[in-house]
């Protein structure tokens, strides 16, 4: 039996054993509030509240005075929550009286399990094992072009599976092709990110559009659709809004895998509370997922010139740094690539992206993968996409309707084509 087959069967066995029946988390009569701090004292109150109870869920990090924060509150916690806000004179706005009802309004269309190897498409979302089976089928049907790769492991023993694509070989005129690394799904609830990653894989292998063919043939691609498999499985079996890994920390679970990378870890924009959605972990690379994936990427040092991380939502394009407002030394080039990329994303459907450096464009966030890649791996171009929908979508932002998978992915690929063209023109692929 081939290594690829052995790996796949082991993966599916692990997934099957881990997917035991669990009571699905529901949010009936949970309320969602938008709050906004007006001063540092109010911000500290919110920081203390974040991670204080699993009955109060912050959908946004508590980082900046004046920034809107979405908070989901269990029915029995509402009186205490409002009392705390009232005592500190923190302004709030009720956005949903029944979070579950709001979530149910979006039909995400999840594919029937076990059908993916013959009917994988982008009209629906897929569970982890079906996507892994599809990746395996690509390696089998595209020998010499697609290689199954294991980017790392998870706490629950799953593999972080992806593909290496070398269309036309790994060299051009005797020289190694530049490398593009793409990871998605590091935050479990952001389903559109893995879906877009698989769409890109398919387009690289099948598209007859000239600029996409050039993108496939001129670069070596490393694509990992699920950088947080345990968390993604948990969003399907138990809690659709789960974000973190599934490592146990006392009575709470998981660390934020995009605050856990070993570059200015936990300096700003992360929490030290294990119950928080932005928990940085007890130490840098405490999570098996980030540690093992970082080791894989370190093995590619010198081979990757462009690093991409797919997230959702808000329609942002972001570049380093997240730990400081100081700008990269090649910020002028980042701005040129940024301008070309957001112009391209707008052309097909008129979708508007904004962004810039992470710290100033959205919020401080140390320990992110793009910062680590740029800061430690000599990857001079590193970007994070926050995909559809827009930042005003609030609660339903993580539940992009399945009919938007294709347009969201098409405009993303348009942007990546323009990005690669600009990065090449600036000499980073030389």
Swiss-Prot record:
Question: Active site annotated at which positions?
Answer: 386
User: Residues that bind Zn(2+), according to the entry?
Assistant: 187, 190, 311
Q: Is the keyword Secreted in the record?
A: yes
Q: Which family does it belong to?
A: Belongs to the peptidase M14 family.
Compartmental location: Secreted
Residue ranges the record marks as coiled coil: none
Domain Peptidase M14: residue ranges: 124-423
Q: Which SUPFAM superfamilies match?
A: Protease propeptides/inhibitors, Zn-dependent exopeptidases
Recorded protein name is: Zinc carboxypeptidase A 1
Q: Please give the InterPro entries that the UniProt record associates with this protein.
A: M14A-like_propep, M14A_act_pep, Peptidase_M14
What Pfam family is a match for this entry? Peptidase_M14
């Amino acid at each position: 039996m081939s290594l690829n087959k052995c790996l796949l069967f082991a993966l599916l066995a692990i997934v099957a054993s881990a997917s035991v029946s669990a009571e699905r988390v529901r949010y009936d009569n949970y309320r969602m509030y938008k709050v906004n701090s007006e001063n540092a004292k109010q911000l500290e109150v919110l920081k203390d509240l974040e991670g204080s109870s699993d009955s109060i869920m912050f959908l946004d990090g508590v980082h900046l005075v004046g920034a809107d924060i979405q908070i989901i509150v269990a029915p029995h916690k509402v009186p205490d929550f409002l009392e705390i806000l009232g005592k500190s004179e923190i302004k709030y706005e009720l956005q949903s009286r029944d979070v579950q009802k709001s979530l149910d309004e979006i039909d995400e269309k999840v594919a029937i399990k076990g059908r993916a190897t013959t009917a994988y498409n982008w009209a629906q979302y897929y569970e982890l094992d079906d996507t892994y089976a599809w990746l395996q089928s690509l390696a089998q049907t595209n020998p010499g072009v697609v290689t199954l790769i294991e980017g790392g492991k998870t706490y629950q023993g799953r593999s972080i599976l992806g593909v290496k694509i070398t269309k036309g070989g790994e060299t051009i005129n005797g020289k190694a092709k530049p490398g593009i690394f793409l990871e998605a799904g590091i935050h479990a609830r952001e389903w559109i990110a893995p879906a877009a990653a698989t769409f890109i894989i398919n387009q690289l292998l099948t598209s007859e559009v000239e600029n996409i063919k050039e993108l496939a043939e001129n670069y070596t691609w490393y694509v990992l659709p699920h950088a947080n498999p345990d968390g993604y499985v948990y969003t399907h079996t138990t809690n659709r809004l789960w974000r973190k890994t599934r490592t146990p920390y006392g009575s709470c679970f998981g660390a934020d895998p995009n605050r856990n990378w070993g570059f200015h870890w936990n300096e700003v924009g992360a929490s030290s509370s294990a119950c928080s959605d932005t928990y940085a972990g007890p130490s840098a690379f405490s999570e098996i997922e980030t540690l093992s994936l970082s080791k894989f990427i370190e093995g590619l040092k010198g081979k990757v010139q462009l690093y991409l991380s797919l997230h959702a939502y808000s329609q942002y394009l972001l570049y380093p740094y997240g730990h400081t407002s100081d700008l990269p030394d090649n910020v002028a080039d980042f701005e040129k690539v940024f301008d070309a990329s957001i112009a391209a994303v707008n052309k097909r459907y008129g979708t508007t992206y904004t962004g810039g450096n992470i710290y100033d464009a959205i919020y401080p966030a140390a320990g992110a993968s793009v910062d680590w890649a740029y800061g430690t791996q000599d990857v001079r171009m590193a970007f994070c996409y926050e995909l559809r929908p827009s930042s005003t979508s609030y609660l339903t932002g993580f539940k992009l309707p399945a009919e938007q998978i294709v347009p969201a992915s098409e405009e993303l690929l348009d942007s990546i084509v323009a990005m690669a063209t600009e990065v090449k023109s600036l000499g980073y692929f030389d």
